[in-house]
From Swiss-Prot:
Organism: Dichelobacter nodosus (strain VCS1703A)
Binding site for pyridoxal 5'-phosphate: W103, T153, D172, Q195, N236, T237
Gene: serC
Co-factor binding comment: Binds 1 pyridoxal phosphate per subunit.
Gene Ontology CC annotations of this record: cytoplasm
Recorded family membership: Belongs to the class-V pyridoxal-phosphate-dependent aminotransferase family. SerC subfamily.
N6-(pyridoxal phosphate)lysine modification, residue list: K196
Cofactor names: pyridoxal 5'-phosphate
UniProt KW keywords: Amino-acid biosynthesis, Aminotransferase, Cytoplasm, Pyridoxal phosphate, Pyridoxine biosynthesis, Serine biosynthesis, Transferase
Involved pathway(s): Amino-acid biosynthesis; L-serine biosynthesis; L-serine from 3-phospho-D-glycerate: step 2/3; Cofactor biosynthesis; pyridoxine 5'-phosphate biosynthesis; pyridoxine 5'-phosphate from D-erythrose 4-phosphate: step 3/5
EC number assigned by the record: 2.6.1.52
Protein name: Phosphoserine aminotransferase
Substrates-to-products reaction catalysed: O-phospho-L-serine + 2-oxoglutarate = 3-phosphooxypyruvate + L-glutamate; 4-(phosphooxy)-L-threonine + 2-oxoglutarate = (R)-3-hydroxy-2-oxo-4-phosphooxybutanoate + L-glutamate
Length: 358
């Protein structure tokens, strides 16, 4: 095998090497059945066993209470931007949203097609460097829910806490899923695309409070959470390969020590990188410190030209995916669960060398 690189892309994400090796081992012959897991029927006992354990592990590891169901739905977070509103605003009413960046804005745009959305806070156009203090946010009590994007990958922003706002929360945790505990007591829906921390792209992992599962006769069955729950995530032929990899990743998360382990690792990785950025004159991070993301670290060199030279040269040192989002430029290192400390250390070594030469 050729040397693996350190993958800092924002998604699809770097996956744990033991998971990839297990998938490689079983690729042509899963559990001696003579077929790949990509070929076996989703109605077979083998796949139903994978699905059952995946759903069970997903719920157990994230600490979701019994009054939540867990769903695996083909598509991604963009689809959930609409589905959350389609299900929770089907009977009218309005919802709030904290428009904290590009992904919250996308969620707002989709939800507005369905019902009335109230912007409780709006990020400035372009580069955003701060977030609102959620504890002091004015939230009308008549809102059906408030939508929050827990971590904004583009600007490197993350809410350090997700407090009770007095109305139920709908959380998009796509980029920090399974990196920290979640406030289940006041959530109605928690969702995320799996491609950041958990599996290949093409699927969303969704937790819905059971009391929110209702039949909506004016809604296509595929877009109704109740139908997915009633079908045990088998409403249509599911993305079996993504579910299989998710199953392996969840087992790996459990073996490593669960969410508590990865919360500590996220703090350790990001702190090391931010400390290096803050203690030299070549790199800078403009995000207000208390809102800095532990998952997506953004930074800049003294010029756009050097930013480009940095990520291009980094690729020749087995450090890939460091180019910032096209909307804001700069540089970005995505530190998802499978990113080892060795990757951060290698990045810092390169940053030091690059700064010395420029």
């Amino acid at each position: 095998m050729s040397k693996r690189v350190f993958n800092f892309y924002p998604g699809p994400c770097t996956l744990p090497l033991p998971v990839l090796q297990q998938a490689q081992k079983e690729l042509l012959d899963f559990e001696g059945c003579g077929m790949s897991v990509m070929e076996i029927s989703h109605r077979s006992q083998r796949f139903e066993a994978i699905l059952a354990e995946t759903l069970s592990l997903a719920k157990k590891l994230i600490g979701a209470p019994d009054d939540f169901c867990v769903l695996l739905i083909a598509g991604g977070a963009h689809q959930q931007f609409a589905m959350t509103a389609l299900n929770l605003l089907a009977d009218g009413g309005s919802a709030g949203i904290v428009n904290s960046g590009l992904w919250a804005k996308r969620a707002l745009e989709e939800a507005q097609r369905v019902g009335k959305m109230v912007e409780l806070w709006r990020a400035p156009d372009g580069k955003c460097t701060t977030l609102p203090d959620l504890k002091t946010l004015t939230v009308p009590k008549n809102l059906r829910y408030v939508h929050l994007t827990s971590n904004e990958t583009v600007d490197g922003l993350q809410f350090p806490e997700l407090p009770d706002l007095g109305v139920p929360l709908v959380l998009d945790v796509s980029s920090d899923y399974y990196t920290r505990p979640l406030p289940w007591d006041y959530c109605d829906i928690v969702y995320g695309g799996v491609q950041k921390n958990l599996a290949p792209s093409g699927m969303a992992l969704v937790f819905v409070r059971k009391q929110c599962l209702r039949e909506h006769t004016n809604l296509a069955r595929f877009f109704c959470y109740k139908h997915h729950a009633d079908a045990n995530s088998l409403l249509n032929t599911p993305p079996t390969w993504q579910i299989y990899i998710l199953h392996l990743v969840l087992k790996w998360i459990e073996q490593q020590g669960g969410v508590a382990h990865f919360a500590a690792l996220a703090q350790k990785r990001s702190a090391k990188l931010y400390d290096f950025i803050d203690n030299n004159d070549f790199y800078r991070n403009d995000v207000e410190k208390k809102y800095r993301s532990k998952i997506n670290v953004v930074m800049r060199t003294p010029s756009d030209a050097l930013d480009t030279q940095f990520w291009q040269e980094a690729e020749t040192h087995a450090l890939v995916g460091l180019k910032g989002h096209s909307a804001v430029g700069g540089l970005r290192a995505s530190l998802y669960n499978a990113m080892e400390m060795a990757g951060v250390e290698a990045l810092i070594d390169f940053m030091h060398d690059f700064a010395q030469r420029h």
